[in-house]
Design a protein with these regions (language model features):
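Short coil-to-beta transition motif at edge beta-strands of beta-rich domains
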Residues: 110-125
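Short alpha-helix capping/helix-loop boundary micro-motifs
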Residues: 88-113
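Glycine- and charge-enriched low-complexity intrinsically disordered segments
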Residues: 152-191
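Short, solvent-exposed secondary-structure boundary/capping segments
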Residues: 89, 138-156
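Acidic-enriched and Gly/Ser
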Residues: 74-89
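Active-site-proximal polar cores
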Residues: 1-74, 191
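Short beta-strand and beta-hairpin "edge-sheet" elements
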Residues: 122-145
């Protein structure tokens, strides 16, 4: 039996931790734009997305965990040859997500899973003027500190443009694909 005189995770302590995290993200983070993926056409048999679009961008503060450069940078041998991925990890506040972005995304009919950031959505980072695709969302880290989770950790890779329609209304993002870059690389292959 647990000691009844020591209460783990009172609402006041949880709110204090969440406020401290929000304050740190505002001080040490950067403003990024979260872009939810909208599904236009989908194959009903294998549930493959045939066509998708990004029609809105929501600013939110995020902390970049690996300022030293891209993460592990594993070199993969794919069917098209050797491929090197460029990965970044962003940390965003769960409370800011639930209060600011979730109500806006929930009202969109062609967006799925509005309760948290989801894999396949995009993050626009103005520091490098690049788009990153969310590959994995860690929503239980740190693991229930004071019996609550406070942040989402987004593991992202440099976005490779295929057939997506990107028209967010934010000129910095929309011009990103009209200039020299389509997948984060110039036409000559330099990053």
């Amino acid at each position: 039996m647990l000691n009844p005189f020591f209460i783990q995770g009172t609402a006041g302590e949880q709110n204090l931790i969440q406020d401290l995290i929000n304050e740190q993200l505002r001080m040490y983070g950067v403003e990024v734009h979260y872009m939810p993926r909208s599904f236009i056409h989908e194959n009903s048999v294998i549930r493959e997305v045939i066509e998708s679009s990004f029609e809105s961008a929501y600013p939110i503060e995020a902390y970049i965990q690996n300022y030293e450069g891209y993460a592990d940078n594993p070199v993969l041998l794919s069917k098209f040859g050797i491929e090197q991925t460029q990965e970044l990890t962003f940390v965003i506040s769960k409370e800011r997500w639930e209060n600011y972005i979730e109500p806006l995304v929930r009202d969109k009919p062609d967006v799925r899973l509005s309760s948290r950031p989801k894999e396949g959505d995009l993050i626009y980072l103005p520091l490098g003027d690049r788009l990153y695709e969310i590959k994995y969302v860690e929503h239980e880290k740190p693991f229930y500190q004071l019996q609550k989770n406070y942040v989402y950790e987004l593991r992202c890779e440099l976005f490779r443009y295929e057939d997506e329609v990107i028209d967010t209304g934010v000129m910095e993002i929309d011009d990103n694909l009209l200039g020299n870059e389509t997948d984060g690389y110039d036409y000559d292959g330099n990053s």
